[in-house]
Amino acid sequence: MPASPQSSEMFIGLMSGTSMDGADGVLVDFSGAQPAVLAAAHTPFPAPLREAFGALQQPGDDEIHREALASNGLARVYADCVATLLRTASVTADRVAAIGAHGQTIRHRPGQYDGTGYTRQSQHPALLAELTGIDVVADFRSRDVAAGGQGAPLVPAVHAALFGAADETRVVCNIGGISNISILPAAGTGRPVTGFDCGPGNALLDDWIHRHRGTPYDDGGAWAASGKVDESLLDQMLAEPYFRALPPKSTGRDLFHPGWLQSLLDTYGNAQPQPVDIQATLATLTATAIAQDVQRYAPEARRLIVCGGGAHNDFVMTTMANQLPGVLVQTTGDFGVPVSQVEAIAFAWLARQCTRRAPGNVATVTGAAGPRVLGAIYPR
């Protein structure tokens, strides 16, 4: 007889990040000493859905209607991803305890306006539960924000479990649409895990190459590598106050969006750098923001472990390595965890924590008043 969902240790994690290219999903078994990924899948966004979420990153007309329809569309993409996972693993829905669904971030303003601020991950978890027949856990970030935190990053606890070491400080870096780092002190030092968002990851790079070459991303960073970094433009980018702000801090596409880049390019008038050189400069910005934060906040680290789509960008990876002499730059794949699966694993784990009424945040990372149970449950 299959295990009931209440006793099962199988959870699904679904992540659609700020790159807005699609949904990454994993089916994870937490019954062993280490989580075991039973299946993984990527379901691309249809072009209209990607365009809808892109438009929702900035204020516009009839937002409530457009956001509601985009949420419905995302639920259907998520449901397709779940179906692929179950089919691949030959697992039936009634054996899965819950789905941890992140949603699509369209605004992230913690601590702003009224002292509390807000974060908005657009999705329709009730529809997802209806389509899959599985309990859904969603809205992970808002409780941390309500407790005075940034609501991000939420993955450092999982980074520590998967990649922490007894004998050395390590930094785990996720390069999605936005980049973030988790600083994992050597076990026994008594120092807490910390982490924060560094700045833009792939988002501006993907937007720029799509605008000029019609491709969704810069494969391997080849286009960036063929250009020349514009040092003046890079300096202007790095003058953004966010890079000087102290942790805890978090950011998103509502700051680092195409309009942010265009406002810098407008200062050049008709003497703007060539598009390929802007791509090289954007890639260098991603690498430099990460490298500077590693040097500033984890100078003792000798290992940087990278995950997310940016791990496939050879130009970014090489630039980071050049800026961090003495630091071994690796990927999570070197530790047996594919770079595309880490965040989805994290949201499967967060769903598990929620169903057990156990905290999911790390207050030293987010700045929240303390540990909190994250997420809201939508029964199947």
From Swiss-Prot:
* Record GO biological process: 1,6-anhydro-N-acetyl-beta-muramic acid catabolic process; amino sugar metabolic process; peptidoglycan turnover
State the reactions this protein catalyses: 1,6-anhydro-N-acetyl-beta-muramate + ATP + H2O = N-acetyl-D-muramate 6-phosphate + ADP + H(+)
What UniProt keywords are attached to this protein's entry? ATP-binding, Carbohydrate metabolism, Kinase, Nucleotide-binding, Transferase
User: Superkingdom of this entry's organism?
Assistant: Bacteria
The entry lists its GO molecular-function terms as: ATP binding; kinase activity; phosphotransferase activity, alcohol group as acceptor
Q: What is its EC number?
A: 2.7.1.170
Kindly list the positions annotated as binding ATP: 17-24
Pathway(s) this gene product operates in, as recorded in its UniProt entry? Amino-sugar metabolism; 1,6-anhydro-N-acetylmuramate degradation; Cell wall biogenesis; peptidoglycan recycling
UniProt similarity note: Belongs to the anhydro-N-acetylmuramic acid kinase family.
Stated role: Catalyzes the specific phosphorylation of 1,6-anhydro-N-acetylmuramic acid (anhMurNAc) with the simultaneous cleavage of the 1,6-anhydro ring, generating MurNAc-6-P. Is required for the utilization of anhMurNAc either imported from the medium or derived from its own cell wall murein, and thus plays a role in cell wall recycling.
Q: Which HAMAP family match?
A: AnhMurNAc_kinase
Protein name, entry field:
Anhydro-N-acetylmuramic acid kinase
Q: Give the organism the record lists.
A: Cupriavidus metallidurans (strain ATCC 43123 / DSM 2839 / NBRC 102507 / CH34)
Phylogenetic placement of the source organism: Bacteria, Pseudomonadati, Pseudomonadota, Betaproteobacteria, Burkholderiales
